């Protein structure tokens, strides 16, 4: 066994690894199955902020929002059994949104496993379908190794959640073990042949349409894609709830493909002769139930850029498949020699005009005019304001009429999970305290997570709800 920093409990070693991996905030509901870890977190309170939530779903939704905003794995901790079940909602959201997350779950003592002990759950079975990986740390001397693995898996390739089970007796074991190094994220770099193939498709296209979405973006990647679209006369649509990846005020913006998609935009998608899909999986919501793009071979030429090779060709067969991080592809696209034939200028102008026309309501409102509310918010809120949007029909107002202008100004679950907006807004205000945060939530979502307002008051988070 490697020697490290003297004898430490498994729980202390775990918290030490969190510090090493750059964790500054943890969202949790305390429970008796991980008391040793809680004690170590108390000792580390000057380095790691522990936010004690009112319900585990609130904790995992806050961790998911943190992961979206920062690009780093959000960290949640819940207790065994019922706590793990409550927390699964935010984990599922992280999986469908490709958000990096690590959730630590207390577990029964090792000598009580496989007896259906009090609150025992097999997390490999329960979490296996909604996590990239599920691991259990049975030996305290493996804590550095397996925690590092969890962060690496959560942040690499297609990001997503990893569940780590920590038996309560393992946390008390005393070990002398070396710490891990800070985890690193593996990113794929685009190659010259892939860019040559992409350029070849764009060169012969008269009606290209780019669709941006998914995870792995950065402010630089968004700026580079915008520069590419400008230089090459390509209209850009956003996949479901990803409008903040392209400035909605920009002349190349064509609107969102989702529940509030303009009929003219869906018609334009069908009319396009080339789809350049960057970061999006082309899921059900973006493709109108897989009806807007034919399966498995699209009627258009398809260039599909994604950070994980396993997703390319999984549903739609691309003509050009590019495995690359968003920053790598966007940078290469920006630097590519521009091709902007005059024939595409009108195509871009019409796409943007269709989007602007769709900002006008088609029905008169009775009572509160939500379109007018969105107009006021568009005028009054700064460009970097963060909007958190819950699930339900009401969310269509912010989806259709609010104009997102900067990267990471929208937090919304593509899984359609109700109860997200309030905890996400609380997390956003704690994570980015210099940015105003507005949460849109319906009566159902508010009933599901409204208790987290008490968490907001306790920790000084003050979003507008």
Feature locations, PLM:
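Glycine-rich, acidic loop regions that bind phosphate or pyrophosphate groups
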Residues: 105-146, 168, 242-348
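Glycine-rich phosphate/diphosphate-binding loops that line cofactor/substrate pockets in enzymes
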Residues: 13-23, 66-71, 95, 153-158, ...
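Active-site diphosphate/adenylate-binding microenvironment
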Residues: 11-15, 19-21, 32, 37-42, ...
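Phosphate/pyrophosphate-binding active-site segments
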Residues: 2-5, 177-178, 200, 299-395
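A short, small-residue-rich loop immediately preceding and capping a beta-strand
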Residues: 24-28, 48-51, 69-108, 211-214, ...
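Glycine-rich, anion-gripping cofactor-binding loops and their flanking helix/strand elements
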Residues: 68, 214-303, 403-435, 447-451
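Thiamine diphosphate
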Residues: 104, 113-114, 118-119, 259, ...
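Conformationally flexible catalytic loops at phosphate/diphosphate-handling active centers
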Residues: 149, 153-204, 357
């Amino acid at each position: 066994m490697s020697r490290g920093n003297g004898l430490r409990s498994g729980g202390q070693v775990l918290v030490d690894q969190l510090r090493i991996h750059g964790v500054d905030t943890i969202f949790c509901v305390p429970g008796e199955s991980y008391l040793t870890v809680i004690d170590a977190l108390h000792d580390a309170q000057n380095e790691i902020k522990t936010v004690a939530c009112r319900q585990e779903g609130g904790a995992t939704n806050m961790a998911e929002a943190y992961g979206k905003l920062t690009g780093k794995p959000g960290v949640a901790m819940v207790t065994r059994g019922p706590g793990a079940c409550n927390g699964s909602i935010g984990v599922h959201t992280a999986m469908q949104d490709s958000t990096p997350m690590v959730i630590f779950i207390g577990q029964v003592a090792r000598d009580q496993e496989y007896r259906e002990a009090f609150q025992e759950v097999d997390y490999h079975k329960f979490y296996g379908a909604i996590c990239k990986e599920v691991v259990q740390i049975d030996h305290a001397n493996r804590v550095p190794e397996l925690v590092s693995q969890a962060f690496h898996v959560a942040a690499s390739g297609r990001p997503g959640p990893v569940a780590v089970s920590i038996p309560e007796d393992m946390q008390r074991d005393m070990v002398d073990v070396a710490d891990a190094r800070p985890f690193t994220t593996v990113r794929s770099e685009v190659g010259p042949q892939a860019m040559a193939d992409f350029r070849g498709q764009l060169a012969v296209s008269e009606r290209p349409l780019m669709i941006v979405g998914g995870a792995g973006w950065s402010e630089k990647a968004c700026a580079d894609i915008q520069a590419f679209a400008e230089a090459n006369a390509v209209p850009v649509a956003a996949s479901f709830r990803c409008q903040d990846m392209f400035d909605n005020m920009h002349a190349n913006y064509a609107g969102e493909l989702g529940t509030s998609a303009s009929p003219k935009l869906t018609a334009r998608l069908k009319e396009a002769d080339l789809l350049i899909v960057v970061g999006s999986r082309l899921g059900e919501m973006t493709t109108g139930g897989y009806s807007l793009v034919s399966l498995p071979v699209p009627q258009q030429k398809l260039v599909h850029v994604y950070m994980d090779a396993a997703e390319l060709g999984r549903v739609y067969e691309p003509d050009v498949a590019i495995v690359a991080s968003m920053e790598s592809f966007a940078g290469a696209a920006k630097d590519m020699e521009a091709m902007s034939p005059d024939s595409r200028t009108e195509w871009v102008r019409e796409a943007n005009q269709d989007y602007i026309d769709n900002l006008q309501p088609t029905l008169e409102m009775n009572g509160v005019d939500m379109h007018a509310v969105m107009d006021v918010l568009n005028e009054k809120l700064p460009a970097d304001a963060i909007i958190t949007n819950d699930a339900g029909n009401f969310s269509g107002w912010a989806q259709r009429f609010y104009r997102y202008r900067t990267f990471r100004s929208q937090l919304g679950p593509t899984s359609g999970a109700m109860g997200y907006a309030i905890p996400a807004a609380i997390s956003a205000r704690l994570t980015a305290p210099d940015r105003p945060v507005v949460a849109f939530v319906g009566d159902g979502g508010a009933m599901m997570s409204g208790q987290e307002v008490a968490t907001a008051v306790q920790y000084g988070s003050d979003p507008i709800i």
